[in-house]
């Protein structure tokens, strides 16, 4: 789980940061949106295909300032999410109303290999 994301950052911007070094490393990504404010909720979920990659991702991003404009002094934090594992995550979100949204930019990204 990625925390303390600046609220104005959108899915595309966050994925650019992640994809610099981890473009093929994950199979699930979701940046929840506050539809009333039209901003992200400040956190995102990512599932890595390999647990080994989490260590590198953690060392690269944990406690680092966001490398994006207008982020002030916000620092990136990482933690484990309540739901773990690709299958469990997919089962959880397939029941979610977010999957009924028309705009793909607000839905979770699920990558099937």
Please identify what each model-predicted range represents.
Residues 1-41, 49-74:
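Canonical RRM/RBD RNA-binding surface and closely related RRM-like beta-sheet modules
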Residues 13, 51-113:
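Catalytic "initiation/cleavage/transfer" segments centered on a nucleophilic residue
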């Amino acid at each position: 789980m990625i925390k303390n994301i600046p609220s104005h950052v959108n899915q595309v911007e966050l994925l650019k940061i992640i994809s610099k070094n981890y473009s093929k490393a994950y199979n699930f990504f979701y940046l929840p949106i506050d539809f009333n404010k039209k901003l992200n909720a400040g956190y995102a979920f990512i599932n890595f295909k390999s647990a080994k990659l989490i260590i590198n991702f953690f060392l690269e991003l944990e406690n680092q300032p966001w490398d994006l404009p207008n982020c002030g002094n916000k620092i990136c934090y990482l933690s484990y999410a309540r739901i773990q594992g690709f299958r469990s995550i997919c089962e959880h979100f397939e029941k979610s109303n977010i999957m009924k949204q028309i705009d793909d930019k607000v839905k979770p990204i699920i990558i099937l290999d």
